[in-house]
């Protein structure tokens, strides 16, 4: 009986390692599209995912939001993800990172109060959020992110959906 229990525990411990993929040092590249509430516009961009360890991922990205009502924006994010596998093909990850955005306004934009106010505003900030990743096939994945960007005068909620490949 004792040997049976030890064998079962050993078998379970060995099979657990198969649930955690070995990603350390791998790089993924993909595209993303989404919506941001403050700019009230759709955006598209690219992202890179670099696994520093099996669970810690560095994710820089660039996104451009199309012009709407005389306003447009582009942004660069440098996020960190802590990937938590929930099944063999699905993972959740909290998001934390830094943000830089460039906001452009036409002269007739509602945000321009007087003629002397600059029409371009640069905003550093912080990102916090949650993401979900689903591995579609070998080296192919889809991801969905919901994050809040803390910016001076322009804080916003942003939803992004992406698609990417691992190398």
At which residue positions do the language-model features occur?
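A generic hydrophobic-segment detector
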Residues: 122-167
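Short glycine/proline- and aromatic-enriched beta-strand/turn motifs that initiate or cap beta-hairpins
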Residues: 20-65, 164-166
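A cross-taxa feature marking solvent-exposed loop/turn segments within ectodomains of secreted
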Residues: 22, 39, 87-89, 137, ...
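Residues that define the transmembrane beta-barrel architecture of outer-membrane proteins
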Residues: 25-27, 40-44, 72-76, 122-126, ...
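Gram-negative (and chloroplast) outer-membrane scaffold detector with strong preference
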Residues: 49-112, 119, 123, 134-140, ...
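Sequence/structural signature of outer-membrane beta-barrel proteins
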Residues: 32-38, 63-69, 100-105, 145-153
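Membrane-embedded beta-strand positions of outer-membrane beta-barrel proteins
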Residues: 27-33, 58-62, 78, 94-96, ...
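Cleavable N-terminal export/targeting peptides
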Residues: 1-24, 167
